[in-house]
């Protein structure tokens, strides 16, 4: 139903998700499917007449069955080796369709990838970054408000020529620029967010040999005050070295439901406080506030 395969990206999503995000995937249909598919095997196991055996005997039986299956698999592959090897070389994504090997392969690939480690060494970028024209002492420091998160598909966006006006309020403005030639690095937050804030293209990012600092690190080094407010499942390490906060559920806020999920507009209630942070006496050269929204998030 979800149209997914268990690849390294999906394993990464599973590791980095939270309860609120995972609960979006739970439905009556999913529960009924699990029950219907598992009822017969469970009943068979419960009714089976299991004979007690020694640990050595059980181990010997397991080894014998595994060896037999391995030999049989090798013989099958040997008989069709040439077309099989050619197919696997030309269609590498097929390895993620083989259950349950795809789960083991993807999990091992993520676990052994040094770039996945949270303590991996970062290569510095933009060490010469600076503000060319700092604000005068008599003028207010500039503020950049950057909204990041799930959005509609570009082809279904009213500003981009979609036949239905899906952006009625934005369409009334004359100061809106829609970048129609912008492409996401992926369809999951764990893939697209780090790539979006990197200095590399999509191709170079996914083939990189080391981890680098991101745009927020460069802005902070240049003297700007950077703050990340998250209303989703985290910043995926992007905001690890700048001030950040997970948006808290507000029980009395009509924009928050009983499950603890708040609409993105709830973040605007405290936006004025974020703009005043840090105090002006800190020599602030400007502020960058990132709002990571839930957006049109879903399974």
Kindly give the residue locations of the regions a language model identified.
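Active-site-proximal alpha/beta segments of enzymes that process anionic O-linked groups
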Residues: 78-143, 151-299
């Amino acid at each position: 139903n979800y149209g997914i395969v268990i690849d390294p990206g999906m394993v990464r999503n599973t590791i980095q998700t939270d309860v609120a995000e995972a609960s979006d995937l739970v439905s009556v249909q999913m529960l009924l499917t699990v029950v219907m598919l598992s009822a017969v095997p469970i009943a068979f196991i419960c009714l089976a007449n299991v004979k007690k055996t020694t640990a050595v005997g059980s181990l010997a039986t397991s080894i014998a069955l595994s060896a037999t299956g391995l030999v049989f698999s090798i013989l099958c592959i040997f008989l069709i080796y040439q077309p099989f090897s050619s197919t696997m070389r030309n269609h590498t994504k097929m390895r993620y369709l083989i259950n349950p090997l795809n789960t083991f392969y993807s999990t091992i690939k993520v676990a052994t990838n040094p770039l996945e480690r949270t303590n991996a060494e970062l290569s510095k970028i933009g060490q010469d970054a600076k503000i060319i024209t700092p604000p005068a002492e008599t003028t207010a420091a500039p503020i950049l408000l950057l909204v990041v998160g799930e959005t509609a598909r570009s082809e279904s966006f009213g500003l981009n020529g979609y036949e239905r006006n899906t952006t009625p309020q934005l369409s009334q403005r004359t100061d809106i620029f829609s970048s129609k030639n912008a492409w996401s690095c992926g369809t999951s937050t764990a893939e697209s967010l780090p790539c979006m804030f990197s200095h590399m293209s999509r191709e170079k990012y996914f083939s990189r040999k080391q981890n680098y600092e991101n745009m927020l690190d460069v802005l902070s080094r240049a003297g700007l005050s950077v703050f990340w407010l998250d209303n989703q499942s985290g910043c995926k390490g992007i905001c690890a070295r700048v001030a950040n906060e997970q948006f808290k559920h507000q029980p009395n806020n009509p924009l928050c439901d009983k499950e603890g999920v708040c609409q993105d507009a709830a973040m605007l209630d405290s936006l004025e406080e974020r703009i005043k942070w840090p105090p002006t006496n800190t020599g602030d050269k400007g502020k960058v506030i990132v709002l990571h929204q839930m957006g049109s998030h879903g399974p």
